[in-house]
């Protein structure tokens, strides 16, 4: 089987997904013509030499595979999906908003098929008349593993990971946690929330604003992680993940990965979270309503992309979830580990290939 694969190879979420899909293509013996979006950089990942050589050969020989009859899988945003390498293009993408615009629907329909991560995103486009929309689900990154180390056994260690954004409720999560646990030495909150699209000065301003100009002895802001190994160590170090309180996700990889590593995640029962988070493997919080998605930076009102609302939650319901999660500290989330065994990238690739065939 031959496939053209157009995707970014970098340390961001799309790059992580791309590397995992490539690994499964390699295992299946698929002949791939790899067209990187942007400068390829796989230094964030521990890639075995044979697989690494295969990736490089797939880039070097991409024009040998290129043919109008070879299907192209493009892993990218709707914004920027209007060009194609071959006649049949299958866009693999993510969507966090709730009201597909005319332009987004036009671009989705332009593809042979548009594969949206998660049923929530797919339903938004199906209901808007995009009959070529198909859902798929991500898998658990096999490079993540349980280290078995003891990190801070004397403290209840909470963690939040993901770009600082309004739609992720980053500031609200931190402020809610501080209201309950701020300066209590029994508890620690570690935040890996650097947004690489902001300058260092902008990030400092966001953090200062979030903390209300106060100093807290039990909250840490960590630098942006450059490697998967650092992410793995972070997820192993925490007891309770709060990244799942995001109000709109294409999948929610940090909370999903933490869950699959046997940690306890407090998860908003909405959007793509509903595809993997259950009452058995997560501490679920029900939404209290919806609010506009617009932040004036990544989501701008009346723009051609990313319009609509995100889900919100009440502080009271999250306080209650914190307490439920505390009770589980020290116990392994066995159902979460089972989730990681069920959600594999082999299955993800099979779902994508099924859409092609």
Regions found by a protein language model. Give the residues of each.
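Nucleotide-activated donor-binding/catalytic signature segment of Leloir-type glycosyltransferases, i.e.
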Residues: 200-229
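Donor nucleotide-sugar binding/catalytic pocket of nucleotide-sugar-dependent glycosyltransferases
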Residues: 112-126, 130-146
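Conserved donor-binding/catalytic core segment of Leloir-type glycosyltransferases
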Residues: 150-168, 174-177, 189-191
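A charged, aromatic-enriched C-terminal amphipathic alpha-helix characteristic of glycosyltransferases
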Residues: 309-320, 326-356
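Extended catalytic core of nucleotide-activated donor transferases of GT-like folds
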Residues: 4, 41-124, 230
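Short hydrophobic beta-strand element within catalytic cores of glycosyltransferases
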Residues: 264-267, 283-285
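Acidic donor-binding loop of glycosyltransferase active sites
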Residues: 233-250, 263
């Amino acid at each position: 089987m031959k496939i053209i694969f157009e995707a970014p190879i970098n340390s961001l979420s799309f790059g992580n997904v791309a590397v995992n899909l490539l690994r499964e293509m390699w295992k299946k013996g698929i002949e791939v013509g790899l067209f990187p979006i942007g400068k390829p950089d796989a230094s964030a990942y521990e890639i075995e030499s044979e697989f690494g050589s295969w990736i490089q050969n797939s880039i070097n020989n991409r024009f040998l595979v290129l043919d109008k009859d070879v299907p192209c899988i493009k892993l990218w945003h709707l914004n920027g999906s209007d060009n194609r390498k071959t006649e049949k293009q299958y866009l693999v993408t993510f969507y966090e908003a709730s009201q597909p615009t005319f332009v987004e629907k036009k671009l989705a329909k332009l593809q042979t098929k548009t594969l949206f991560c998660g049923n929530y995103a797919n339903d938004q486009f199906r209901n808007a008349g995009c009959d070529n929309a198909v859902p798929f689900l991500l898998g658990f990154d096999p490079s993540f593993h349980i280290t078995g180390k003891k990190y801070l056994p004397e403290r209840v260690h909470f963690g939040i990971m993901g770009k600082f954004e309004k739609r992720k409720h980053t500031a609200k999560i931190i402020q809610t946690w501080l209201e309950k646990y701020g300066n209590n030495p029994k508890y620690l909150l570690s935040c890996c929330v650097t947004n690489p699209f902001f300058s260092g000065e902008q990030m400092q301003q966001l953090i200062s604003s979030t903390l209300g100009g106060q100093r807290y002895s039990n909250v840490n802001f960590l630098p942006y992680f450059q490697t998967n190994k650092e992410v793995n160590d972070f997820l192993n170090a925490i007891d309770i993940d709060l990244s799942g309180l995001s109000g709109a996700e294409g999948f929610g990889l940090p909370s999903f990965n933490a869950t699959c590593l046997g940690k306890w995640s407090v998860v908003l029962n909405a959007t793509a979270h509903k595809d993997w988070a259950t009452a058995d493997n997560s501490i679920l919080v029900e939404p209290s309503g919806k609010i506009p998605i617009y932040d004036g930076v990544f989501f701008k009102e009346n723009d051609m992309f990313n319009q609509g609302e995100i889900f919100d939650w009440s502080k009271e319901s999250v306080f209650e979830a914190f307490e439920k999660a505390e009770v589980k500290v020290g116990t392994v989330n066995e159902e979460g580990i089972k989730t990681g065994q069920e959600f594999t990238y082999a299955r993800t690739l099979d779902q994508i290939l099924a859409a092609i065939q």
